[in-house]
């Protein structure tokens, strides 16, 4: 079988100021392409593509169907909490039964290629979401007796939020569908007004024995008008009139201009491949003029997080954008903050009854409003002024990496400065003077841990906010009348609570329980209010970090927790542990999927993106007005290089590491800011312009650079070339689903001899009807039983319909959440425990002396996360 497209080659070469960078981008990215040697069997493992607005995820669904699950980031309820809506999927229905298949995402061209073998022939295809048009293109060629039927399956239950429904809301009306000429369409009217339309057209463009079909599909959304169908039709007519060569050319041109904004290479195929898949993901999920990225991007499915979360999620979603020198993608976030500023002020009036504040709850709708659903029901737990301050820190990052003073001084256009003032204003009436004469905060929430007075989360954010406002007020001579108040707050604010284990959650609340969020260490990273370069600080941070990772055996330390830990270790200059934690993230198969997406029961894609930021932190840091070269590198990484990573102060930084040492650095100033650098050379080095270099002591140097000037620091030859690292015999194309490796996907069931197959089951609770008890005994790998959302305990019980002797139970678990369980049988009217344990894993067989019973119950006594779930629960004689 052959795929349709051959990969083109594009080169990027510079020769600026003794610099030579020659990268064959097509060949370099090719080694990071995710490859599926067997077809993914579910959404979470699928190949994905997107353009910052619409997206698709491709996987096999059933014996003869490939499903392109469709999403569009701005299709929302427009009522209540304004959550995302589900759209449905475009099906490639084949005449034959699928025997084998492969997929490859060609990163260089942002294109999915696939080949499928059936019992009637072969299909090869390519699919892409155009970089600049809201259009999915699929081209498919068939051989033999194979034929394709294209069908759009509209989502009948549009509501994507699996946790919080509003039964009293008027249902959305049924969708309508039809055909006009070559265009087929499905239109959905919303109960709240407006419509969205999925429309497509097909073209049998090759009548030869290799039959080629071409499909264009678009998604349009309008509110409050009903014009989406008209817009969808116009889009299809426009793109179908374009020569296909031009359509492909403009798509590739966008992506080939995008990748060379910066370059990173490390001598580890798994980590380098993961990084470049995140760079692909960023541009697939974000555009400067697109919607703000939530937890799902354009690839949504049923979820418990169908809104914007601001107590960690949006912050880490955008975290890799800045150092990667891809600031244009971050503009979608700036636009969200700027355009919704009045709503943030309205939130403060509603929550704190102040007119000059600005805030959110821990989650908002896509208008920045608190909404009328679960956020309000949870007050005061999720009414936390720190969440919005942390959200604004992201805006400040954009400013610091760009040094665009308009982001601060043009206050009519840009809301940052005034919103930060309002966010800090929300703390004013909360602060009280204690017996020690210090300012103290009341009981507030430390994200996901619990409540505590003077909690370190809010103390660190209040400090950062006041410090930042004073810095900007002084730099831009804003003469803000509130400046003395911020100074007094900083002067009087109580110290961070600590104990023998380091930073506490808050005053009187030690860190006693395993917990996935590093909210009590925000002052270390990303706020950098406390420097680990001071020995007394480093000691307390080391204690805190070790305690966080090990208390209760780290049972609640998740994949993204490890990515955060990697940042923290890199901040301390500990490259060995930074790498260890980054590997821990990548190897956490419970959460990190073969396609690099991150699933915690539902998609939370930001938890993969933050791992890209972790690698950047090992390579380059620039907090505290100091550029640090290779600050967190492990000894095993003898070589590494990067080109045009961006540092705070608007510097482009390139560097080469050879034989475990820094050998070459280039710094280019984009704004003429003061430049201080820790080059991390071993021994003496040379500057190509000595007059611009001044030693400050302790490995710190000042560089005198005007705007658009560059300087090179080096050992050996000044003319060194930035090239990809040699991966040696490492397995390239690490990511993607490999044959027989789907341990965390749909399980391979062996139910021969099951005594419980299809027998009636009951349960303590179910997540929804789609996850009821009988799904756990139906013998189908694609279905499962799940405890109700938020619950960590529950049971499932099988009625064997007569007393039967058995000595084994097989359990197939979804995502490995169960931490404690028991197995019971009913003896007359009494339940008797016959087995206990702590972990199930993907599959586990429990054996025990034979018992005779009609009823058998599996009890989940505790879980690492809510809604633990089993694919199957089966009883065997022996």
List where the protein language model places each region.
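Active-site core of glycosidic bond-cleaving carbohydrate-active enzymes
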Residues: 310-346, 354-358, 380-402, 414, ...
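Acidic/histidine-rich catalytic neighborhood
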Residues: 422-472
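Catalytic cores of secreted or luminal carbohydrate-active enzymes
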Residues: 86-93, 605-654, 658
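C-terminal beta-sandwich/jelly-roll accessory domains of carbohydrate-active enzymes
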Residues: 660-749, 841
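Disordered, acidic Ser/Thr/Pro-rich linker "stalks" and the adjacent N-terminal cap
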Residues: 526, 734-806, 812-820, 836, ...
């Amino acid at each position: 079988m052959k795929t349709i497209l051959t990969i083109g080659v594009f080169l990027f070469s510079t020769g600026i100021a003794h610099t030579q960078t020659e990268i064959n981008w097509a060949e370099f990215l090719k080694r990071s392409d995710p490859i599926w040697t067997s077809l993914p069997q579910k959404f979470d493992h699928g190949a994905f593509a997107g353009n910052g607005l619409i997206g698709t995820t491709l996987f096999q669904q059933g014996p003869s169907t490939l499903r392109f699950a469709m999403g569009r980031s701005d299709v929302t309820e427009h009522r209540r909490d304004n959550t995302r809506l589900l759209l449905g999927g475009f099906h490639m229905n084949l005449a034959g039964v699928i025997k084998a298949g492969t997929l490859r995402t060609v990163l260089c061209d942002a294109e999915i290629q696939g080949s499928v073998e059936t019992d009637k022939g072969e299909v090869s295809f390519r699919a892409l979401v155009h970089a600049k048009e809201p259009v999915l293109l699929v081209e498919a060629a068939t051989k033999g007796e194979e034929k394709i039927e294209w069908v759009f399956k509209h989502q009948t239950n549009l509501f994507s939020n699996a946790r919080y429904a509003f039964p009293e809301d008027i249902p959305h009306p049924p969708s309508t569908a039809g055909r006009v000429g070559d265009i087929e369409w499905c239109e959905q009217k919303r109960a709240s007004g407006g419509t969205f339309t999925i429309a497509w057209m097909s073209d049998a463009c090759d009548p030869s024995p290799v039959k080629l079909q071409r499909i264009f599909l678009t998604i349009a959304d309008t509110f409050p008008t009903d014009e989406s169908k008209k817009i969808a039709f116009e889009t299809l007519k426009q793109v179908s009139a374009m020569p296909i060569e031009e359509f492909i050319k403009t798509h590739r041109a966008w992506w080939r201009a995008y990748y060379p904004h910066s370059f990173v290479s490390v001598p580890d195929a798994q980590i380098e491949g993961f990084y470049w898949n995140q760079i692909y993901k960023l541009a697939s999920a974000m555009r400067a003029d697109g919607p703000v990225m939530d937890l799902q991007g354009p690839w949504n499915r049923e979820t418990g997080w169908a809104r914007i979360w601001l107590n960690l999620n949006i912050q880490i979603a955008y975290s890799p954008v800045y150092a990667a020198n891809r600031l244009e993608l971050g503009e979608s976030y700036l636009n969200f903050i700027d355009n919704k500023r009045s709503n943030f002020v309205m939130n403060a009036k509603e929550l704190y009854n102040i007119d000059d504040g600005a805030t959110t709850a821990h989650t908002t709708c896509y208008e920045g409003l608190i909404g009328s659903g679960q956020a309000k029901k949870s007050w005061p737990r999720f009414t936390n002024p720190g969440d919005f301050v942390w959200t604004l820190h992201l805006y400040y990052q954009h400013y610091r990496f760009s040094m665009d003073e308009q982001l601060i001084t043009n206050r009519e256009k840009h809301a940052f400065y005034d919103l930060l003032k309002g966010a800090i204003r929300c703390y004013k009436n909360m602060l009280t003077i204690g017996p020690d004469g210090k300012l103290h905060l009341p009981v507030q929430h430390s994200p996901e841990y619990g409540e505590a007075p003077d909690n370190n989360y809010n103390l660190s954010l209040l400090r950062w906010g006041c410090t930042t406002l004073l810095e900007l007020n002084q730099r831009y001579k804003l003469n803000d009348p509130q400046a003395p108040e911020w100074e007094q707050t900083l002067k009087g604010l109580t110290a961070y609570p600590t104990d023998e284990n380091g930073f506490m959650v808050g005053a009187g609340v030690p860190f006693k329980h395993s917990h996935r969020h590093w909210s009590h260490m925000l002052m270390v990273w990303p706020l950098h209010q406390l420097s680990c370069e001071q020995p007394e600080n480093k000691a307390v941070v080391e204690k805190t970090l070790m305690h966080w990772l090990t208390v209760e055996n780290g049972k609640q330390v998740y994949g993204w927790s490890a990515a955060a830990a990697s940042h923290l270790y890199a901040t301390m200059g500990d490259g060995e542990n930074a790498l260890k934690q980054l590997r821990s993230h990548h190897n956490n198969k419970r959460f990190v999927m073969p396609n690099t997406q991150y699933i915690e029961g539902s998609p939370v894609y930001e938890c993969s993106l933050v791992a890209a930021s972790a690698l950047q932190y090992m390579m380059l840091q620039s907090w505290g007005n100091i550029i640090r070269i290779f600050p967190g590198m492990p000894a095993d990484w003898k070589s590494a290089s990067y080109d045009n990573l961006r540092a705070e102060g608007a510097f482009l930084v390139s560097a080469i590491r050879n034989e475990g040492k820094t050998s070459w650095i280039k710094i280019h100033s984009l704004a003429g800011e003061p430049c201080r650098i820790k080059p991390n050379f071993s021994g003496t080095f040379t500057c190509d312009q000595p007059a611009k270099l001044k030693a400050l002591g302790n490995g710190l140097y000042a560089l005198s650079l005007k705007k658009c000037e560059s300087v090179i620091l080096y050992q050996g030859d000044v003319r060194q070339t930035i090239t990809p690292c040699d991966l040696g015999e490492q397995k390239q194309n690490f990511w993607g689903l490999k044959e027989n490796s789907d341990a965390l996907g749909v399980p391979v069931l062996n139910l021969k001899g099951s005594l419980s197959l299809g027998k009636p089951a009951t349960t303590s609770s179910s997540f929804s009807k789609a996850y009821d008890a009988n799904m756990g005994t139906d013998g189908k790998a694609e279905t499962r039983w799940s405890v109700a959302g938020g619950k960590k305990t529950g049971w499932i019980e099988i009625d064997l319909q007569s007393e039967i002797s058995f000595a084994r139970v097989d359990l197939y678990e979804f995502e490995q959440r169960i931490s404690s369980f028991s197995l019971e049988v009913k003896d007359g009217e009494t339940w008797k425990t016959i087995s206990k344990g702590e972990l199930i894993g993907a599959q586990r067989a429990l054996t025990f002396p034979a018992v005779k019973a009609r009823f058998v119950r599996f009890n989940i006594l505790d879980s690492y996360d809510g809604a633990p779930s089993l694919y199957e629960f089966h009883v065997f004689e022996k």
